[in-house]
Amino acid sequence: MSVSVFNRCWSKVILETLVRQGVSHLCIAPGSRSTPLTLEAVRLQNAGAVTCHTHFDERGLGFFALGIAKATQSPVAIIVTSGTATANLYPAIIEARQTGVNLFVLTADRPPELWECGANQAILQQNMFGQYPVANVNLPKPNADYSAQWLISLLEQAVFQQKQQGGVVHINVPFAEPLYDATDEEVNSHSWLQPLQRWLIQNKSWINVEAQQNEVLMHENWDHWRTKRGVVVVGQLPAEQAMGINSWASAMGWVLLTDIQSGVVPTTPYEDIWLANQTVREKLLQADIVIQFGARFISKRINQFLQAFKGEFWLVEQSGKALDPYHHSLTRFNAKVHHWLRAHPPLRQKPWLLEPLALSKFCATFIEQQVGGNLTEASLALRLPTLLPYNGVLFLGNSLLVRLVDALTQLPESYPVYTNRGASGIDGLLATAAGIGIGSNKPVVAVIGDTSTLYDLNSFALFKNVTQPTLIFVINNNGGAIFDMLPVDEQVKDQFYRLPHNGDFSQIAAMFDLKYAHPYTWADLNSVVKQAYSRRKATLIEIKTNPSDGSSLYKRLIEQISHAVIGA
């Protein structure tokens, strides 16, 4: 039996199994040991079953796959060769695990006889990602003693675990040489595949698992709790689950606190700012019940409120993950928000607390005055909705600007917002944005800090394949301006936290053949944006600001509002 032919047969069964589980995008890094998987991926692409994407940097490739999976809400498979190539996927695997994004990570490996004996590019890859995958599938070296049916069943068992929890399945696949001298005809006619012939021509899984019924029942005490004073807090949600929350909370007369990732239009905008007001915060803590939809709040003030609240606490979130960092004694509903709302009709009543609305209106005027008309981080955050395309998507990086956007921006209802807030790292943000663009096939606005951009420069190469207008805003405040929020000596802060780079991104754009603009005023920016939307390619828009402008304004707004006296 030819080793190279059987390697391909083994790989064929693996990828055919994943395709039947919803994989339509394969992200591939170049490498020799992964050749059997790569050649089967090419065969599937030629058959129209999948789309293959390539990238030379495995760390970026992992986040690119993450972005596609976020946008398509379908699992994505990654194929890499053996050695440290595999380790570069770790950050994306962590982010996927934290947020329940489904990835299949296929790591080619040296065969066991080459482990721990000084062989080249052979590292310990079994279970190498620790507890972050929902399942680790450590396959043996391809061997006809194992039936193809066994291989499918083993993989589908891991898929079942993924569907229950959401996250990453790591499949480690050792291959012995030779890797190259197999033809499609030899693979397709191999006797080992004969029991699968009917399965191979059908688009159905090997094991049929009936969908779990997730009917949401009204809480037995809902008629009691809906008469009480409540606060609705909305965190990160899929866009389709945002509809109806605002009107439901308004009908109840309850206070609504929203995160920028929620897709919900706030009734009392600028929550991150006005929650700094101690008088209003103390009154808000007198609520009888808090109902939280979604999780992972950006706002420090909302998090502080959740931590301080000691009353009845309900959490509605579909993943089943533990998402209460403040460890309330709570009632948990594993449900989609719109299903839960349908089962819990509102009781129409007047607002029980008027101060948030009054303070929100005051904030609107005060913030406009403080931000002014210059092109700055804060003004970009405040007026970001005017730059967004209809039927587009927004990606926010993890920098000072995401906090400013959360504090100042009011987006249209259900406007898709993507972030990497599972681990909130600054790695892979460009790659994720590129993946979201490819996966959604919609115009994309990505807003990313300069340090984050420097950390992921290789991923600019991924934007050459976008087919929709893509605007990459790089906020260049000369380093990590978010660290201005820390109570650290200025000299120490510059040397060990902010790390000024004193550079710009014009040459980077040229290197990756991207359109580039550096607007100085809002008039310049509006012209640049108009041109960018006329092109079905990526434009890098660099916004240069003074290092401390954004953080100083943010701190000033919070300080001023914290002492404001507003009559309801």
Curated annotation (Swiss-Prot):
Organism expressing this protein natively: Haemophilus influenzae (strain ATCC 51907 / DSM 11121 / KW20 / Rd)
Family note: Belongs to the TPP enzyme family. MenD subfamily.
Protein's name according to its UniProt entry: 2-succinyl-5-enolpyruvyl-6-hydroxy-3-cyclohexene-1-carboxylate synthase
GO molecular function: 2-succinyl-5-enolpyruvyl-6-hydroxy-3-cyclohexene-1-carboxylic-acid synthase activity; magnesium ion binding; manganese ion binding; thiamine pyrophosphate binding
Pathway: Quinol/quinone metabolism; 1,4-dihydroxy-2-naphthoate biosynthesis; 1,4-dihydroxy-2-naphthoate from chorismate: step 2/7; Quinol/quinone metabolism; menaquinone biosynthesis
EC numbers for this chain: 2.2.1.9
Matches recorded under InterPro entries: MenaQ_synth_MenD (IPR004433), MenD_middle (IPR032264), THDP-binding (IPR029061), Thiamin_PyroP_enz_TPP-bd_dom (IPR012001), TPP_enzyme_TPP-bd (IPR011766)
Function: Catalyzes the thiamine diphosphate-dependent decarboxylation of 2-oxoglutarate and the subsequent addition of the resulting succinic semialdehyde-thiamine pyrophosphate anion to isochorismate to yield 2-succinyl-5-enolpyruvyl-6-hydroxy-3-cyclohexene-1-carboxylate (SEPHCHC).
Gene: menD
